[in-house]
């Protein structure tokens, strides 16, 4: 069985994203929530524990992997920053604003960022 605590703790991009998310929150330009696909209860437990180390006032929405993120929240006019293109296509189809997170920034289909706080500069 996968040790989600270990996976989250050894993923440096998550730590950087928390710093970037803090910058976005401090801008007061966005109503920020974390919408995350999960495969299991242990995974969401570890994700929540990790996020709560940095933020006690951000809403965390766990979406079962079998459901579209558009079924969990109202996407219309909302921004989704995601690394998975299919999530972004569904988000756009539901009237949302898709932004691709990609360290390589190789996409022409979506606005693309390699740091989540870059949305402050492009939106």
Predicted features, each with a name:
Residues 28-29, 55, 95, 102:
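Glycine-centered loop/turn motif at secondary-structure junctions
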Residues 50-62, 109-123:
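Structural recognition of alpha->loop->beta junctions
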Residues 19-23, 72-74, 87-94:
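A short acidic, amphipathic alpha-helical/loop segment
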Residues 35-78, 85-88:
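Substrate-recognition "cap/lid" segment bordering the active-site pocket of phosphatases
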Residues 79-116:
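Acidic, Mg2+-coordinating phosphoryl-transfer loop and its flanking beta/alpha structural elements
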Residues 2-33, 42-45:
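Short, acidic loop-to-helix structural element flanking the phosphoryl-transfer center
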Residues 28-31, 75-78, 96:
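Short coil/turn segments at beta-strand junctions that form active-site/ligand-binding loops
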């Amino acid at each position: 069985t996968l040790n989600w605590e270990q996976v989250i703790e050894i993923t440096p991009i998550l730590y950087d994203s928390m710093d970037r998310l803090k910058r976005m929150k401090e801008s007061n330009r966005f109503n920020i929530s974390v919408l995350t696909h999960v495969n299991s209860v242990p995974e969401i437990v570890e994700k929540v524990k990790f996020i709560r180390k940095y933020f006690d006032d951000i809403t965390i929405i766990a979406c079962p992997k079998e459901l579209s993120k558009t079924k969990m929240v109202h996407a219309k006019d909302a921004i989704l920053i995601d690394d998975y293109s299919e999530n972004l296509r569904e988000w756009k189809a539901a009237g949302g604003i898709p932004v691709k997170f990609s360290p390589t920034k190789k996409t022409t289909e979506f606005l693309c960022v390699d740091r989540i706080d870059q949305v402050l500069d492009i939106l």
